[in-house]
């Protein structure tokens, strides 16, 4: 028996892979307590298990199973007590570069600390909190422009790759594990952060203020507040602060200028919905300037529409090029898994012009990327439409 315990896209992905490779009768899932069976900004493990006909179990039920081949925790919300299991093949993919950032809020601390690298780590589960022997990890870069939600999305994508890399050896038992060291081993408990109070501390340097805004920026749950307004961007100016930290030096239509310990900053407030609605006709120069009014190039609304998705649907190749130069994902997907290329396909068919489509493919757009119904772009095309796109499909 294989057990998947957890939540979100990584747990759903693991379940889909296992069912595809081994069948649905060999696996059971333990969804997190707050999994209501509905997809939102992340997919529901409970919903996917029901769709696939996979058994849903409780932790207590699983602890009694004797023939567990693999127990894998993927963002699971309960403490695993390995001594309660009938097996020692209990593993976790932790969202940090262990031994660093044990515990909670692993999307927050690397951002506020200004880290340039992060990782996802596969480890054995022991009686400690994220202290088990390390089997493997996958490292990746963290941009200075990344918010906490951007880091979380990178965790998800890299954990999928780590899962693919180690699934077979976890099942066979043909792997080695190394004890964690004590150097750079830090632990953050639940009480280390209070997301119910996201008013920013202004008695700090300009750099610290910017890191706070980026670290608290996780739109599905909250945006940081300054003067009670959702805040998305901090621009550090070259003007040394002459007034006390937190003093408002100037006010604009959608920003304020504030003093800090060292340099004045421009603070921009959230305008995402207006920004997205204006992309179809917005001049490129205005677009570049208005990027300060959203939480980064991969920001998205409640439908999962990001700037590059909206630009693709409306055929704004100039905007797409600018977004890609700033780090936007060419394979971005909305909350149904609809990709940038799928949106571009609609524009090209409406205008009978495939130049945008060809541009995206040449830049690395994946024509075989699956949406969350398990369909790729070709599945949505008629024979005439396939002929229109030619050999690209």
What does each model-found stretch correspond to?
Residues 1-220, 253-267, 271-273:
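One-carbon transfer enzymes
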